[in-house]
Amino acid sequence: MDTSLFSLFVPILVFVFIALFKKSKKPKHVKAPAPSGAWPIIGHLHLLSGKEQLLYRTLGKMADQYGPAMSLRLGSSETFVVSSFEVAKDCFTVNDKALASRPITAAAKHMGYDCAVFGFAPYSAFWREMRKIATLELLSNRRLQMLKHVRVSEISMVMQDLYSLWVKKGGSEPVMVDLKSWLEDMSLNMMVRMVAGKRYFGGGSLSPEDAEEARQCRKGVANFFHLVGIFTVSDAFPKLGWFDFQGHEKEMKQTGRELDVILERWIENHRQQRKVSGTKHNDSDFVDVMLSLAEQGKFSHLQHDAITSIKSTCLALILGGSETSPSTLTWAISLLLNNKDMLKKAQDEIDIHVGRDRNVEDSDIENLVYIQAIIKETLRLYPAGPLLGHREAIEDCTVAGYNVRRGTRMLVNVWKIQRDPRVYMEPNEFRPERFITGEAKEFDVRGQNFELMPFGSGRRSCPGSSLAMQVLHLGLARFLQSFDVKTVMDMPVDMTESPGLTIPKATPLEILISPRLKEGLYV
């Protein structure tokens, strides 16, 4: 009898044990902690509102209270906020593909050819193909070497124009310049030449038509960055997209049309030139490359038509290269002016390794370790994309033990991560030496060290990081070699930041410059 009871209960006990074991192995849908104060319908939106609010700083303060992974409800969408390098590593390694998409936003629709600009495009075959083409045909090391003359000549032209201004003003006393605007024109010139073979600013006069195009291009790029950083109701509440409460979408559509006119003109001019040259034309710039690919039918299988593919990819490159480099150089020079001993150290390094009888060249940069450290430290303190770009989960995944559902948006607070006191001593101080002999001497900026990733990491990292670093290194070295620089009455530089997609300096960088080299080196 006992044996019969035992044989009856054993299978039942085994079944119960297996069921309990399976239940314990099921993934727990643990949600990241959410800040208190969420309101019905709008969620946490009111905590992030404010015209002059710096979102990366606000989110950084929240992270101090709620931890390195937070969940915010912004209208009808969930947003997962990352604020530590450990959580970022989890996102950009094991979960990189799951988090590789972009959300559809009003800015991307109205100004980005219905999300075709690859920096804002959702994860798709189209995004992969456009990114690959841009990388191979403009941003690869081979192509950058071929286009080196464009970068070098534009940097040289700025030095020449600044010197000419000094001569024009009398050639004896330091002359005041708004350096920020000069650097912005230099970067826009550089990208427009690489993409479309045109030059807008400095070095001679333009036809009235080109002068107006230059003005519209500068205005369009500025408006794009302003509008893409603005909150629109439809981004938080897609069902209300039909009603433009704030008028921002109207502005976006207008900016999109203005930029489209310029891009259309570039393409048409290239088509006419190709007709004239017949089969003898060469792919001298990116528009030519894209037209050749279109003629070969390379875009026929993709989501967008050939012309949209060309326009959107050209726009992506112009936007990516024209804003970030001048912003970083502006911050670097501002930091040096507020730390004059470091400014002198940088100029002394150039004088020792290069001298004053020739201009700094690319080949000199490897010996200018302090210049390299200054750029790294500037990118650490003022990353051009402090929150990288919004990502969106294309499938359910687990990040740092928290469940992230499909459709959840993600923000990575690089600004906060790169000021982590566990990693950096005196994290809010400007100390380039930390990248030479200090705690960060092994860190690189290419996305392999998650403690320092100003260009992002993983599939969505910036494909133009090599070009950016070349411009930053040579641009800073040439400027510091060419000019002595100081502020008016030796006053500290105002380091106030302005809201936006990047970290714009709120005020102009008005400085006094005077030449350090002999006249022949500016010509």
From Swiss-Prot:
EC number(s) reported in the record: 1.14.14.-, 1.14.14.165
A GO molecular-function annotation: monooxygenase activity
Which Pfam families is this protein grouped with?
A: p450
Role this protein plays: Involved in the biosynthetic pathway to 4-hydroxyindole-3-carbonyl nitrile (4-OH-ICN), a cyanogenic metabolite required for inducible pathogen defense. Converts indole-3-carbonyl nitrile (ICN) into 4-OH-ICN. Can hydroxylate xanthotoxin (8-methoxypsoralen) to form 5-hydroxyxanthotoxin (5-hydroxy-8-methoxypsoralen) in vivo and in vitro.
A GO-annotated cellular component? membrane
Any one Gene Ontology BP term: defense response
Cofactor names from the entry are: heme
SUPFAM superfamilies, alphabetized:
Cytochrome P450
Enzyme type, top EC level: oxidoreductase
The membrane topology term of the UniProt record is: Single-pass membrane protein
Indicate the family of this protein: Belongs to the cytochrome P450 family.
Annotated compartments: Membrane
Q: Which UniProt keywords apply?
A: Heme, Iron, Membrane, Metal-binding, Monooxygenase, Oxidoreductase, Transmembrane, Transmembrane helix
This protein is called Xanthotoxin 5-hydroxylase CYP82C2
Residues spanning the membrane: 1-21
